[in-house]
Every structure is written in structure tokens, then in C-alpha cells.
């Protein structure tokens, strides 16, 4: 099977790379083992929230310049501030084309409300997510009776520390009784499958209406809208006060919807999607990938002109750890790695952990190294890359997006298109 590009991994980085290649007229295939980390995410993306020295970033352009001085091995530092901001802007347009309506600005982070009521910097957030500043009075956090993945009283207390006085109430929704018999079924994704039925919308509206008449803002868990945001806009049009939604503990409905929107657009534009498959071997000669072999296709190889590794970090098995080593399991690529094992972590749980910086080494074009030499038609993107701590710096989503679009641009140029 011949393709212009084979993308290994169907998460945020892989999908954005595939979508960008579609726009360049290149035919690509994504090999996906299963659910990506997007299913467990809030669907908010961060670009750069903090610097290695602990300073908070309020101006991203300036922060990128400081990052290059403090952490030259960071993917942003290698690409340059101008390129990072350009790719971030292109990502916003890509997401909008997929129907993912976001709020935010690449140059200046906003602060979104988390499920625990804290404020966290973000680059892009779904339109329904509450962001600062919130009204100091008149907000109400609405829980669902029996739903343990969102605690309105805890969130209200945390918002109080930020000067927001919010009430906390729970609503009864008898239509969800079918899920209550088994606590493991009473999760956001399963609730959404019930509430997304248009026949159930009036019952949810009836439960929220008395609160909407009493308060100036309602904030409830994001437990509807798996496929689209029709119910959210339907409620917005009928409630007398604004409604906002908070992502819950995983699986996250906004994250699942974002993944679905990107995947549908990729396939709609002609991309191929190999679901539930896994790459077991990549054949290469000297510095060129020749074939990609998957578990489900046996002796039928994919023969792409270019290959992109978007297989993720430890969470997605893009990296595998043993007792004394970490490796990239498909090719055994060179890694950023700290040895010995005792130095993989710090005893302070909340400190930046060295293992978070493990990942594949690449050249300036994001081509991974094997024995110190890059492949000329293989690229690595997203959280598989090493040299940075995405949690400490608040840059995980941004690295996925920026490196995905950079790799797509390199492939387009090498394939004969204009750079």
C-alpha cells in the first residue's frame, strides 16, 4: 500500500500533521492503536505557560525568546519564536475548519477554570469553558446528584480564593437513573450518550431553568456533547443566563469530541485511518525508511515516501521503560535520557521530574537520530520528543501542534511543493 506519508499515532500531533498534509494535497494514512491521550484531556491546549526558572509567561513572544536562552534543547527553541507563533496561528485555523470552536490567542494566554475551581493558563479552550475574569457575585456551580466526577462545593470553595463568590447546588435528573445502578457507569461519557438524545433536552432544560432565573452564571460539568455542541447552544438560547461547562475526570467529553472532530475531518478530506492497528517494524536502508509493517496487515507493508512518528510518550507506549533503561520500541532511536535510574526522578512529588524530559533526539528539521545520524524521510513530533517538561512549562498541546505543522511543512517541501 503506497502513501505519500504514514503517520504512526492518532493523537493530537498525528491528526494535525495529517490535516496539514491533506491541505498540501498529500495522501496520508494514520495508524492508531486505540484511544489517544485526547480522550483523557480537557480539550484546552497550552502553548507556553511558564519558563524553566519558574517565571510565569504573560507575553508568549517574549517568553519564547527567554525560553531559547534558558532551554535551548526545547523544540520551540530549535524552531524559533517566529515559526512557533506562525504555526500556532495556523493551528487555530485548522481547528476552526474542523468545527472545533475555540477561544484564545497565541500571543497572550488566558486563564481557564479547572474542575477543582483553580485557574490555569491556556492558549486555546473550547468556547463553553469558563475563563477569567468571572463575575465576583452571582455564579452557581451545578452538580448532578450521584455524579462523583465533579464536586461543586469543592470548586466553589476554590473559586472563593480568587475573589469569586459562587453557590454550589446539585440537580436531580431522573432520566439518568438507568445509569445509577452501577457507579462505574455513571461517568461523563455515558451520561452524554443519554443527554445527547434530543428527547432528553427538555428535561435538562427544566432542571436548569429555576437556577438560571436565580443566578447570573451557571457552571456545570461537561457531560453532554460527545459528537457536537448542539445541546450546549440549544440551552444557551433558552436559559436566561449564560451557561459554561467544566471538563470532568477522564474520560473527558470535550477531549473525546475534539478527537472526533479532527478524525472526521481527516477522513473527509481523503486521509486513511487504520484503527486498532500497531506498527511492529519499520524497514530502513541506510538513512531512509522503506516500509512500515503493522500487526493487522501481516506481510502487506505500507510503503510511504515519508513517515512521521507521533506515537506519544510513556502514556501511549511511544517510549517504554524497563528497570534500568528507556527505549523507543520501534527503531531504538537515540533518546534524551538521564542515567542512572536514581536520577530519573526527584523526591519532591511536585518538582519537575527528569523522566518527563525523556524523548527522541532529532536534528533541527525534527528528523530523529539513530546512532547520531538522522533519517532523511522520517520525522518525530509531539510528546515523543525529548528535552522539555510539558507539565512544568505548560506547553504540551503547543508542542504537539507546532511540531506537527513544522513536519508537514518539511514533507511538503521535500515532496516537491513550495516551502
From Swiss-Prot:
It is an enzyme of class 1 (oxidoreductase). It catalyses: a quinone + sn-glycerol 3-phosphate = dihydroxyacetone phosphate + a quinol. One of its GO terms (biological process) is glycerol catabolic process. SUPFAM superfamilies: FAD/NAD(P)-binding domain. Keywords: Flavoprotein, FMN, Oxidoreductase. One of its GO terms (molecular function) is glycerol-3-phosphate dehydrogenase (quinone) activity. The keyword Flavoprotein applies. It holds the Pfam family FAD_binding_2. Pathway: Polyol metabolism; glycerol degradation via glycerol kinase pathway; glycerone phosphate from sn-glycerol 3-phosphate (anaerobic route): step 1/1. One of its GO terms (cellular component) is glycerol-3-phosphate dehydrogenase (FAD) complex. Its cofactor is FMN. Composed of a catalytic GlpA/B dimer and of membrane bound GlpC. Conversion of glycerol 3-phosphate to dihydroxyacetone. Uses fumarate or nitrate as electron acceptor. Belongs to the anaerobic G-3-P dehydrogenase subunit B family. This is Anaerobic glycerol-3-phosphate dehydrogenase subunit B. It comes from Klebsiella pneumoniae subsp. pneumoniae (strain ATCC 700721 / MGH 78578). The gene is glpB.
